[in-house]
């Protein structure tokens, strides 16, 4: 109905992850289906992915600067070595796809497609027909279903207009309870719970009345909003580090 022949589920172990793990999970799935081509959006089409791959750091130890997120340090390192900037969301994913494809023997022919219309993080609806997912989600959260109708397939609009839109405000009471009641040792076992961040999360849950306040309390230069929200998903679902090492051996349509 919307021009798509088949949709493949990207499992949780890859979907709720930083961009390099997200993209690697997607590439492995597509390769496992014996596909020959992989098309993806990118802000910049003329990127020498091989040059970036050849110049990435061999070890991550040199990037442990506690006042900055790893991604920005990594991007600056690549720019200093190659003169190529990959600081836009889709370009970052595109590099992840190219790198993951190389690691499994390059079975896929990569086809970057120029992103048009709104940028990934735009929160205002476009005057044209293509808007960012962020802008559409903001409108849905505020109950403006009719406004987004021209930007989404009709089947999607019917779902949005009849089903309740869920966001972090609905999950906050459950998350807050978990963070306050769980022992520190239990929180420490959660995936990506590093550098003692569990103490900061627990204190933030005690002192914050809303999820927005909680995010403001926890955020630092090193811990971005996106990383904190991924960590909250792991806490809600009790996801441990050992569980995330097990890659599902299935393809779900």
Can you name each region flagged by the protein language model?
Residues 9-253:
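Active-site cores that bind ATP or allylic diphosphates and position pyrophosphate for catalysis
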């Amino acid at each position: 109905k919307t021009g798509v022949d088949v949709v493949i589920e990207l499992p949780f172990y890859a979907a709720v992850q930083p961009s390099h793990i997200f993209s690697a999970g997607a590439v492995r799935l597509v390769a496992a289906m014996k596909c020959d081509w992989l098309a993806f959006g990118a802000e910049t089409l003329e990127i020498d992915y091989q040059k970036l791959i050849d110049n990435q750091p061999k070890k991550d130890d040199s990037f442990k600067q506690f006042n900055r997120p790893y991604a920005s340090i990594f991007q600056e390192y690549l720019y200093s070595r190659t003169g190529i900037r990959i600081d836009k969301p889709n370009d970052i994913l595109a590099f992840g796809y190219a790198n993951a494809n190389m690691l499994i023997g390059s079975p896929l022919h990569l086809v970057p497609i120029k992103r048009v219309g709104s940028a990934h993080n735009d929160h205002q609806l476009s005057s044209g027909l293509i808007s960012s997912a962020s802008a559409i989600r903001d409108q849905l959260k505020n109950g403006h279903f009719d406004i987004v109708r021209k930007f989404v397939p009709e089947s999607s609009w019917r779902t949005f207009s009849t089903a309740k839109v869920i966001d972090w405000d609905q999950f906050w009471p459950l998350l807050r309870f978990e963070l306050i009641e769980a022992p520190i040792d239990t929180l420490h076992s959660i995936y990506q719970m590093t550098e003692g961040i569990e103490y900061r999360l627990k204190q933030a849950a005690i002192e914050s009345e809303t999820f927005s306040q909680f995010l403001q309390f926890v955020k630092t230069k090193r811990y971005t909003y996106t990383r904190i929200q991924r960590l909250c998903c792991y806490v809600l679902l009790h996801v441990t580090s050992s569980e995330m090492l097990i890659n599902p051996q299935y393809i779900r349509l």
